[in-house]
Amino acid sequence: MNTDDVLAVFREAGAILEGHFILTSGLRSPVFLQKARVFMHADKTEKLCKALAEKIRAADLGPIDYVVGPAIGGLIPSYETSRHLGVPSVWVERENGVFRLRRFDVPKGARVVIVEDIVTTGLSIRETIDCMKDLGIEVVAAACIVDRSAGKADVGTRLISLAAYEVPAYPADKLPPELAAIPAVKPGSRNI
């Protein structure tokens, strides 16, 4: 599965939106990938996550003990990808603004892959890595369905992406006039 195939799945689901969006990262963009419209379809989710699992397997990372998903966006793709890898899925969630592994016991030294939905700046993955390091858990790689930065985001580890789809993103004070003229909406989940 390549970038065009992934974007075709997003288009079929009506998940590529145009307008003025405030991304979870705080950046602004004329394009928003509404992955919830994809993930509401089990067949589309399975297709994408099975392909991502195959790409993770092909990366020859050695044994993987768990897949970790940052809540909220990483919950569905991490679970479905773990199913195809045949390993358990756990997640981190925010507690006072910091990712914590609250509901699971993962042993020190466990080898994990972090699976995210969409990467723009890599912040959620970096925060998940910090949480794992604090617990003595080894992050062998991160993976995502779509890398909006097309490889430019610093995620703090190797990033395996199913699709690289570079979409412009701007700080709020550096918007192009045509984007500034459109009212902004904030569909992301960072502060949930």
Swiss-Prot record:
Recorded superkingdom: Bacteria
Cofactor list: Mg(2+)
E.C. number(s) listed in UniProt: 2.4.2.10
Pathway where it operates: Pyrimidine metabolism; UMP biosynthesis via de novo pathway; UMP from orotate: step 1/2
Keyword terms: Glycosyltransferase, Magnesium, Pyrimidine biosynthesis, Transferase
Binding annotation for 5-phospho-alpha-D-ribose 1-diphosphate: 116-124
Gene Ontology molecular function: any one: magnesium ion binding
GO biological process, one term: 'de novo' UMP biosynthetic process
Pfam families linked to this entry: Pribosyltran (PF00156)
Reaction(s) the record says it catalyses: orotidine 5'-phosphate + diphosphate = orotate + 5-phospho-alpha-D-ribose 1-diphosphate
Binding positions for orotate per the UniProt entry: 120, 148
Keyword Chloroplast applies: no
Transmembrane segments: none
Subunit organization: Homodimer.
Family to which the UniProt record says this protein belongs: Belongs to the purine/pyrimidine phosphoribosyltransferase family. PyrE subfamily.
Function: Catalyzes the transfer of a ribosyl phosphate group from 5-phosphoribose 1-diphosphate to orotate, leading to the formation of orotidine monophosphate (OMP).
UniProt-recorded name of the protein: Orotate phosphoribosyltransferase
Phylogenetic lineage: Bacteria, Pseudomonadati, Pseudomonadota, Alphaproteobacteria, Hyphomicrobiales
Gene field: pyrE
